[in-house]
Amino acid sequence: MKTKKMNLNNSVQEKKGVQKFAEKFKNYVKAHYSVILLMTIGFLAASAINFFNVATGKTIASFNLEEFEVGQVADRTIQANKSIPADEMNPVFIEEGEKIIRKGFPISEDDYAKLKKMSESPMYIDIRSFANSELFLLLLMTLWFMLFAFVPFGRKILIREIIFQVVCFLVVYGMTAFGSKTQIFSSPFSIVIIIPAALFVLIEAILYGQLSAVFFSFMLSLGVFNATFFGSFNITPSCVVPFLFTLASCVSASMIVRKIERRIDMVVVSIVLALIDTMMIVILSVIFNEVFNRLPIVLIGVAFNGFISGILALGFLTPVEFMLNTASVFRLMDLSDLNNPLMKKML
């Protein structure tokens, strides 16, 4: 009898515990529904970029086209499960059920042309690659939400700041994903030229402080990693180099800009950031033993990226302040200066 009462009491306590947790969870969702909705919209937008990224990627049945070459003895058999008609760009016809390459046989030029045809066709989408990329993106969004929901910033995180970060993340993610598919920016060292991550981190640091900018730097860097990772299980320099460069450049930008007080100081920030970006490319090329003839062009490109990021940050700062209804340290310094023309008129 006592045992039954104890079991009944335990079950009642468990139900109360579950109800309390459900109530707390419900209240938390109500309090942060706008942030959760915004994160969900950002995730769906990034997923759309992911889909087009994977659909236009050079992967065949979860294997990368770069793993094959003419004359190589195939280590697996790849069979076409869909027919692909010939076109002007690639006049090769692929029949459904046709074995493109056979394990143990060398790959001919015709075989490689068919592999390339399959990789470029939107009819062949690497589902595993897309799922891997989506899982990484989901974990990234969860980490993002946890950081900005539970880390003590000493101030209230406004929804306007989250909107700004999500928009900037999508711009960086999209430019990295699609820029790496162009021939001129296909190298992991050249793709960093067009990644505007440092620009957004500078604006974030000026408007919302260094801590937010550092966290945002990690989010952007992980986004760049996923955009160049293609959902593969092989971590190569093609995704590591852009990730490390973006992380170093963004964290450096957030550290450099923290003590400036005048707008003219942004020119110095631009020069210093250009030098840091150039040094990072040289260091990464040494670490990964990269030797290529276009290194001087890449160095000029990343230096320009760093310099123009600081200049554009200064130019975009005023309209961003207006749109986000916030004030930067420059605006506060102007208002505290009694010699400022605006203050003279008010006085």
Model-derived regions: residue spans:
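Membrane-embedded alpha-helical signal segments
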Residues: 1-164, 295, 316-321, 347
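Juxtamembrane helix-loop transition segments at the membrane interface in multi-pass membrane proteins
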Residues: 2-18, 181-195, 217-225, 257, ...
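Juxtamembrane loop-helix boundary motifs flanking transmembrane segments in multi-pass membrane proteins
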Residues: 17, 123, 195, 199, ...
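Hydrophobic alpha-helical transmembrane segments
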Residues: 83-87, 107-115, 185-192, 214, ...
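Glycine- and small hydrophobic-enriched segments that form the cores of compact globular domains
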Residues: 114-117, 121-129, 175-180, 190, ...
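Alpha-helical transmembrane segments of polytopic membrane proteins
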Residues: 129-138, 188-195, 238-246, 271, ...
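Short helix-perturbing small/polar motifs within transmembrane alpha-helices
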Residues: 140-160, 164, 169-184, 201-291, ...
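Acidic/His-rich, divalent-metal-binding segments that scaffold phosphate/diphosphate chemistry
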Residues: 217-219, 266-347
